[in-house]
Amino acid sequence: MTRFRWLMILGRICISFLLFFSISSHSETAPDRTTFTMAYSADPAGSLTMAWYHRLISEAFDRLGISLDYRVYPPLRAATLLKTGKIDVEGLRDASYADDNPDAIIVRESILTTTYGMATLDPEIELKRLADFQHKPYRVEYLRGVEPLGDILKDVVTEGYLSAITSPEQGLQKLLAGRSDVFVDFPGRISALIESMDLSLAGIQVNEFEDDIVVYPVLHRRHVDLAQPLQQVLSEMKAQGLFEQYMEETRKVFLLPHDQ
């Protein structure tokens, strides 16, 4: 095992302990506090970006007197749980998410601007933007429930060449089996999955699209009265420089240099 991989594993263990003690401290010091359940599509214990995001959003809710617990679900499952009121918050959705989800209340203070990426085995497939799929004969797959990715791809991928799958593992497996040409998802999740599935020598290329996607926290509509206070708290934290401070601190836990 390489030294870098050992460092990554050590970093993830540290993140797991930090998340555990963060949750434990809330429950011990304030047992009567309200606790919200938040849905993520990637585990903060294994993702630099999600660990940073979870620290920020947890503090924001903490300032409002609310403890935050989280669960990891596929995007479509998370949307269903929010619709039925079985979770309180979703972590990362774009502004148009509420258009098709009337139970979703967008908190209009962006924490993160993200990008999509693609995995392929074909070195001749070179795409810089999602719009570059137009008029290409590529069999494209994406993870069901990741929006607005699905809507974007439906507009640009050749009819009959686009399909939705239920897990990112399935996306890589079908790619390796020659049943698809491109798998589109978040590049960080793809890269982490390649490592966890021990596919680093499989020849899978991961490239990031140039399109920027701005994402927001989402509340269930029963918490609509919290949308404005949460927006204000996040705005204050951003002005206080905590977004940058916490990112640097999280990078140190993950043992990554500043430019990664």
Give the predicted meaning of each segment.
Residues 31-47, 130-148:
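Short loop->beta-strand "edge-of-pocket" segments that line small-molecule binding or catalytic clefts
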Residues 54-63, 123-127, 131-139, 216-249, ...:
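Extended ligand-binding regions for polar small-molecule ligands
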Residues 67, 144-160, 235-260:
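Ligand-binding clefts/hinges and TM-proximal coupling segments of bilobed small-molecule sensing domains
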Residues 71-135, 144-148, 208-209:
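Acidic, polar ligand-binding/catalytic clefts
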Residues 76-88, 155, 168-189, 196-197:
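Short helices/loops that flank or line small-molecule/ion binding pockets
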Residues 80, 92-102, 181-210:
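A ligand-binding cleft/hinge motif common to bilobed small-molecule-binding domains
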Residues 112-117, 195-234, 254-259:
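Periplasmic-binding protein-like
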